[in-house]
Amino acid sequence: MKLHKHRGQMSESLLTAAFIILSGGLQDAYTYLCRGKVFANAQTGNIVLCSAYLFDGQWRHSARYLIPVLSFLLGIFAAECIHRHFKYMEKVHWRQMIILAEIALLFAVGFLPQEANTFANAVVSFVCAMQVQTFRKVRGHAYARTMCIGNMRSGTEALCVYFHTHDREVLCKALTYFGVIGLFAIGAGLGALLSAHMAERGIWVSCALLAVSFFIMFIREEEKA
């Protein structure tokens, strides 16, 4: 049971999270810029556009934004099922199993042509949802690795508390949240460059980033064991 505790802590480390957050920003830029202006992570934006087209009577365009929303819900459901069935595995942590599944799915997306954008966006949204459900803390602080508004609120709140209390631990918390936002922005910028130069296959860099997190978790587990 002690080994499980260390693994959970490692999944919350900033080093592990950094590559996952970069991957998340990349995925959002990729689907928006390369796959028909649909968001992989920002489901609020998809819901707004889905409703706008729906009320305008453009059913086909509305469905284009509804599908990733439904896929996102399915991804959360799938991640929780994996957690419940495999949380006591000894050799491979259940979070690492999810990362492997994400890598396989995103790698397949890189082969899909523009004509399959709806399916590609659904797969990427599914992967993003699995990440949201699986990696929910960094340095012990709850965060969203794919959406910035919650991190902006938490970071600014912590910064305000620091100005009143001068508690350095609270300052560290604020900087962690703003660091997450910065990493996401860098990932989005990287996604824009890759979409321009590698087109559909740019998503493969996201696979590489996730693979780094996967192996970091292995290395650190061996050090703690």
Where do the model's predicted regions map?
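Cytoplasmic-side transmembrane-helix entry/capping segments in multi-pass membrane proteins
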Residues: 91-100, 121-123, 144-148
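Small-residue-rich hydrophobic segments that form or flank transmembrane alpha-helices
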Residues: 10-60, 131, 135-175
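A membrane-interface helix-boundary motif in multi-pass transporters
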Residues: 90-96, 189-208
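Helix-to-loop junctions at the C-terminal end of transmembrane segments
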Residues: 77-90, 195
